[in-house]
Amino acid sequence: MDNSMMDSTLRRILFFSNEFPSDDLKDLFRRLDQHSKDRRFRLLSIFLEESTAILKDEVSKLPRPLKELVPPFNSVLSLVDVDFRQGPLGAAMESSMLTILELGLFIGHYESEDTEWDLVPGQSVLAGLSIGILAAAAVALSSSLADVAKTGAEAVRVSFRLGVYVADISTKLEAPQSDGTLSSWAHVVTEMTEASVQDELKQFNTGTHSPELTKVFVSAADKTSVSVSGPPSRIKAAFQHSPVLRYSKSLPLPVYDGLCHASHLYTRSDIDSIINSSESVILPDRSVRLALLSSQTGKPFVAKTASDLFLEIGTELLTGTIYLDNVTAGIVQHLQPQSKETSSCQIDSFRTSLVLRGIHSAVEAELSRDRQLTRRDLVSWISRDFGPRRPRSQASSKLAIVGMACRLPGGANDLDLFWKLLEEGRDTLTTVPPDRFDLNTHYDPTGKTENATQTPYGNFIDRPGFFDAGFFNMSPREAEQTDPMQRLALVTAYEALEMAGVVPGRTPSTHPSRIGTFYGQASDDWRELNASQNISTYAVPGGERSFGNGRINYFFKFSGPSFNLDTACSSGLAAVQAACSALWAGEVDTAIAGGLNVITDPDNYCGLGNAHFLSKTGQCKVWDKDADGYCRADGIGSVVIKRLEDAEADNDNILAVVLGASTNHSAEAISITHPHAGAQKANYRQVLNQAGVNPIDVSYIELHGTGTQAGDAVESESVSDIFAPVTPRRRPDQRLYLGAVKSNIGHGEAAAGIASLLKALLVYQKNLIPKHIGIKSEINPTIPKDLERRNVGLAMQNTPWPRPAGKKRLAVVNSFGAHGGNTTLLLEDAPERVKIQGTEDRITHSILLSAKSKTSLQANMESLLSYLDQHPETSLADLAYTTSSRRMHHNMRFGTLVSSISGLQKMLRSQLDNPNFASEIRPVPNEAPSVILAFTGQGAYYHGMGSELFAEFPYFRAQVQQLDRLAQRLGFPSVVPVIENRIEDAPSSPILTQLSVVILEIALARFWSLLGVSISAVIGHSLGEYAALAVAGVISAADAIYLVGRRAQLVEERCAQASHSMLSVRASEDAIQEMLAVELETASITYEVSCCNTNQDTVIGGPKGEINDIRRALEAKSIKCTILDVPYAFHTAQMNPILDDLETLAKAVPFKAPSIPVISPLLATVIYDVKSLDANYLRRATRETVDFAAAIEAAQDMGLVDSKTIWIDVGPHPICAGLVRSMIPSASAIPSCRRNEDSIATISKGLVTLYLAGLTPSWVEFFKPREREYSLLYLPKYRWNETDYWIPYIGTWTLDKAHLKHGTKPKTPFSGSMSRPSALRTSLVHQITAETVEATTATLHTISDMQHPDFLEAIHGHTMNKCGVATSSIWSDMAFTVGEYLYRRLVPNTKDVHMNLTDVEVLHAQVASKTKGSVQPLVLRAHLDLSTNSMSLAWFNADGETGECAAESFATATIRFEDPEAWRKDWARLAHLVRGRIEVLEQRATEGKASRLSKPLAYALFKNVVDYADRYRGMDSVVLDELEAMAEVTLVPERYGTWHTPPHWIDSVSHLAGLVMNGSDASNTRDYFFVTPGCDSFRLLKKLEPGARYRSYVRMSPLPEDPNMHSGDVYILQGEEIVGMVGMIRFRRVPRLLMDRFFSPPTTTSVAVPVPPLTGATMKCKDITQTAPALPTPAPPIVVSSPVVSSTMACNIPEPAPLLATSSKSSTPKESPIVTPAESERAEPVDNSMTSQCLRLMARETGLEVEALTADASFVQLGVDSLMSLVLSEKFRAELGVEIKSSLFLECPTIGEMTAWIEEYC
């Protein structure tokens, strides 16, 4: 902090110049921008944001020609690179940028010094020249630095407006030069007085008769110079006209944009238009706080408010003359002493200038000699190093890349191999491997073979099909169908996370909800080629791109965003950029990003070759003169990115830092695939501006470098122009190196960008730029010739790239997409990390390894051993930290505690050398064992217990200290000296002893919880029961301390010390009594049983002498006895004196129900509620026997304890642990502390034990106290247990499809349709075109011809407008026909099929064509699914010529197969109501209140809309009462064709509703007719019978939501029983004048035209090729149809599964069985053969071997997900007749549980 700023006697001038500092302006603005992103410069950031907003606002108001001169910008920094000088906005931009710079530097100076506002009125005065006065005005109006951020932005507004206005006026005086040459509007003349210059100008202006507006005038003057202003041509003429001026010393000033200080030109109205605009947000009444000197008078402006001040300034700038002498005089006057106390003066300025130096010299000359004048620079702060940036927001953060992984060509399956490949300069070019496709058939260099590739070359990864399916919980079947890109995305994501040390949830930034995935992918080879040969259950999740990311999120349980991006060749780096954007936006805290490409499809080779993308000669020849295209490549890469501050907080290794990332598009390119230098350069500038980086500082660029003539030329131009410009030139030590990884490994397309990034990251790690191998002959002549002069070029040899001391290297990575996208990343070195050295290391360290299979675990151990052999110097502490805290852990585990690397190596070798090692590996159980805390009594007390934990772990220390403070507040002594071992060895008092033990135990219990141990129950031994009750929440910790302390005090007060003693006897209570029977009979001794610890371990107590006698007696009988080191005999009569008082004290303590079960040694039971826990309990626990053995037995009996339960002994020494092991020999008992052992080592050993038992302790908490002392090691990656899941492309069908010549006209599907045999043929359903039947699903496609005689006659039975119109009864019959047919195909022995036709909707009326001999085809598609007992149907028009279906269906419906008894029951409840209404109608007809219509009259009324043929006229009579009616119906006896239910019968029993709407007096049938837009359901309890009599009833009513729509239910009765119902039939009112429009016959034989494929399901009738189901599409406008033809909306029903295989069946590679994670007992064959059948079926469907289905194998591990469980469930039912719901796989999660269920219930 500058001390002068705190001097209250200091007189200060702040001078705001009208000139920019002499520094590099771009660099100044970059630094301002970067500082503004630091939270230490909050106000600077606000000012820049406000200024940017104001400039945007002002630019938006400009006239269009001016507005177009300003490029879009997000910050003022973006405008620094734009040259406005030659345009009309030069003055505006220069003025506003100068204002921004000076005020930004001013604000930043104060924030950098972290000083208070110290500009005191009277002591501080402001001065400035020209535009500088506006910046000074912002300070003058401010009373704090925060004010400057607001007022400063308004000063920017005025500066901009002033510049625009002046330029506009000035161009009206003289137009700019047509060639863009800049001319000065002002000259300075020296060694002449103002008067003499004025005389010369007056003579010129008068003599040339100049107009007043264009005269030359004096704009500024001082003692030594005069500034002359005017139009440039007029100034030139004036100097030529006047000999005095011509020969004077003069020079032009850099004033190019117009006139200011011209009183003859501007008036008050001009000033008002700039200053007093209504858009200004300045508070007009804001007070002037500081004096601001006028540049004309040298005196302060008189204005008192903001509006007046800006008005005065505007007047001076436009009309006033600058007099520097007056300014100097004003400054001197302010700095002259006002009192004796004032002794120092200071001028603050922005660097210095000629003018400022003159002012400074003049001021020094005028000041008194006792005045000390200093000058302070307000710019110098900007170059200071303020240490690591503290981001002001997430958007200001730098990003850290912390992990990476790859699968790249040339065997580069890891980073080391990739680097070796680069370092050696290897080329991975090869020909296409046979497992991709056969070059013998698919390669034709001549290009004559259609669909063949013209190049045989590529770059391919090794073993693309190898995958550890079991690790990722996938079945072999699912793995095989899953795209290798998806699989390797999973693998590399895991490896990158492993390298980064990411354990989801370990830190806030790695919480699963804050992790997202971003991957680039540009092809679907596997889905389109390999997997499509045999489409299975997993076709969609295995092939659709979105599942690649989704699978990563699902496996790791990340719930952040998941994006799959396609930007062609830049997809990988664009995904990284999207990830960076998400991090900057705060959408995620950790991002996994990458690019994916695995080549299998020859079609893409052919397409790219035909488009001239690919080289026919081999590898990418980047920058070579013979570059002829790129060479394709596989590639998979993943990186893990965090914000830098998060990575540092997480103790991550940082590979490099991302400063900026951007993507734009080459919109101005000559073609969509041609690169554009301008767009690339704009993207570079965006990234550089975002980071505030000087492009000259970038020293390495990884080029996109495809090796094409256009691409190389354009990229070399853009890179050299921005990063190595002609001026300013790079210094000799600023060499810019270039590289292109495509010359090594080819163009990975979607993975190209990620490969480039991985190379750049390795360059940072290795400090070496690998040599470029792309130039095979000589450099491409299109590359700029002057690259060497610009100090830029390719690294042709392996070139060291050392990190400069104290600096960071900058690198750029480019990736461009063929579609025009450009993505650029800017990187810098990671911050230098100084590892904190610990004062002492831990004695032992936990080393952990895990895997999901035995094979992988053994391999991981081998890898670690190999690593240690190669790196014996490895830090054991770092290794423990890495393997424990920074690894995800799995169910196959190895753990050990070692004290040296050599000891670990020995341990690993001994394990691996054991031939039975693999077979001895056991997985940890799926369900972690329970953990019980056992709290010891005071017998384990010693000084220094837990001291290491107290010193090492802040949490434990805080717990002890908090509890200790509670004890002290209760009046008890501090126990901390005991814990720290700062107490003398003399025996401690009972109070200190017991409090120390209880406080230690409560703290230890909480510490175990911190370490991730979930407690199942507690048990306390004697004193330990108080700690147990506190931990269980029965009493508070404070109450436990209080009771223990007071009890100890009572013991001291009431009980004689050393009068009694306690004896531990190695015998049971009964045995002791038997052995002492003689002594007891003689009453020579007495004792009491204090503790029954085990069945053979008893503690007795009593008077000291008698206990000694007992000891001697028992020892004489060879019984082991030990006198306990306690001063009292607890749990004996000695405690009687304290019991009443103790109980009284305890009654004041609240007891609560335990939060976890309490195992009670007093009651020998498990306590779950508070009923048994009260003050009396504590009384009894003090006096009565501690029956520890019985308590444990009770816990076992109640199921709380089993053989797997883990016991943690909580206390100073593991006493309870020994007791537990005596009771349960197999029990695992862990000590917390142990006498004479480092307690950290004890805890470590316990954590390893817990880990191996199946718990996952919180290692992060264990290492947290000293995490900065540890480093994350780059250990060998996880060793996968891989199997090759590869579906080879068989045959030549990609070539064969080209043989279908475009000119060949296919036969229509109807050619001979009536003659071809069909399994299903009726009057309406004519031909099956496709059919597939599986276990639980069936799909059927049929074709019908409406012109077929039977169909046509059915249509003509229902005519409208003299046209035959298909009634919905036709669709009903077709639906029932297909429904019964398919249902019987799946369930062949069904007696009757009862169908409910629901959701009937028709979009278009089907009108019969009147063209003779025409074909009018219809297509019906149906898909039945037994799992839902439903069948979806959709009807489509088809083209009579081509057979192509319309894109959208004209009708849809759903059939539901239901239980008719349910209908019968429902209708039985309604029948009396319907019959009642019928009776009422009959009665009203008799009374003449309702109309009774005969058949002729009824159908005559119908003719208002529809004319029915005789067979349709089934209604004998009708009673009509407004909108309610009933009809007597007799069906005609003839069927007239082959039907399921004849349409004329359906119509007869149901069209009463149409009569009500179109024949009732309640309807306006003159102007309207009514049509039905569908119904909700149609069902018949039994089939309609020929000639049978029925009754129909309906009541229609308007819908409240739509008055033009009516609805009602049509009931069909036979006798008294309801036998059918049309539910919610709807009718819409339609104007009659639309009849012709909707019901006219088609004019051509083609009623549907081919349309482009839609999203989702589309198909041709002749071609059953299928895609994913379509989503419902928005409904088109309603189309009205006949009364019985529904018309509402169209929707695409979900398409059925594929009907036909489109290629030969793939040959599946032989699968090796997955190594199961357990060497467990196989599921034994059982007598019930159903079990083995089920197992075989599961194995077959999942692709596993039956042997893999072990009893403890979980379905999750086997990859049986919800989809597979549905498949299995249906297979069980269809093949084995076993009803197993899919939910059972959740209820029985393992094979063993499932087989047990089958045995029990099947």
Curated annotation (Swiss-Prot):
Residues 1326-1462 are annotated as: N-terminal hotdog fold. It is an enzyme of class 2 (transferase). Keywords: Acyltransferase, Multifunctional enzyme, Phosphopantetheine, Phosphoprotein, Transferase. InterPro entries: Ac_transferase_dom_sf, ACP-like_sf, Acyl_transferase_dom, Acyl_Trfase/lysoPLipase, Ketoacyl_synth_AS, Ketoacyl_synth_C, Ketoacyl_synth_N, PKS_Beta-ketoAc_synthase_dom. Disulfide bonds: none annotated. Residues 1322-1641 are annotated as: Product template (PT) domain. Residues 396-829 form the Ketosynthase family 3 (KS3) domain. Non-reducing polyketide synthase; part of the gene cluster that mediates the biosynthesis of neosartoricin B, a prenylated anthracenone that probably exhibits T-cell antiproliferative activity, suggestive of a physiological role as an immunosuppressive agent. The non-reducing polyketide synthase nscA probably synthesizes and cyclizes the decaketide backbone. The hydrolase nscB then mediates the product release through hydrolysis followed by spontaneous decarboxylation. The prenyltransferase nscD catalyzes the addition of the dimethylallyl group to the aromatic C5. SUPFAM superfamilies: ACP-like, FabD/lysophospholipase-like, Thiolase-like. Residues 935-1235 are annotated as: Malonyl-CoA:ACP transacylase (MAT) domain. One of its GO terms (molecular function) is 3-oxoacyl-[acyl-carrier-protein] synthase activity. Its cofactor is pantetheine 4'-phosphate. It holds the Pfam family ketoacyl-synt. Residues 1702-1713 have a biased composition (Low complexity). This is Non-reducing polyketide synthase nscA. Pathway: Secondary metabolite biosynthesis. Its EC number is 2.3.1.-. PANTHER family: FATTY ACID SYNTHASE, NON-REDUCING POLYKETIDE SYNTHASE APTA-RELATED. Residues 1699-1729 are annotated as: Disordered. Residues 1725-1802 form the Carrier domain. It comes from Trichophyton tonsurans (strain CBS 112818) (Scalp ringworm fungus). Residues 1326-1636 form the PKS/mFAS DH domain. The modification O-(pantetheine 4'-phosphoryl)serine is found at residue 1762. PROSITE patterns: CARRIER (PS50075), KS3_1 (PS00606), KS3_2 (PS52004), PKS_MFAS_DH (PS52019). Residues 27-261 are annotated as: N-terminal acylcarrier protein transacylase domain (SAT).
